[in-house]
Amino acid sequence: MPCADPVAGILAEILKLYTRRARRLAVRACEASGYDVSAALVDASGETLAFAKGDHSTVHTKDTSFRKAYTVATLGPIFKFETLGAFVEKMRGNPNANAFASLPNILLLAGSVSVMANGESVAAIGVGGAPGGEKDEACAAAGLAKIKDRLPH
């Protein structure tokens, strides 16, 4: 049985550390603007890697942040979008939007960004709880911006 590539394993762990930091930074960015949010980090297949809940965020923000991240991670590579806001805009007026919205864990509300490494989506950060998806997405983008230069290009 062949051994797993140890370098790839180390790089994967480093990537997880950086993206977990970005998730925490997204919550802090929203808190600095006075928003109580939660942030979810999922891998490319939509599995939860980490979750951060702001001190005063409400319980529903756990689900919305996950669903936003899940939507970007699982549909972004197929439909070529890196932010959920871009996909929501693309779906506006599309007769298929209701079909997408009925899929489990899909949420057509802005608030998530894709984490790109070596030109491919490797994770997504979703934020929920600010008064408007565009504000959630700005916080997710702010968290990602803090670590983006450290990710493999």
Write out the residue ranges for each language-model feature:
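Flexible, solvent-exposed loop/hinge segments and secondary-structure transition points
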Residues: P2-H153
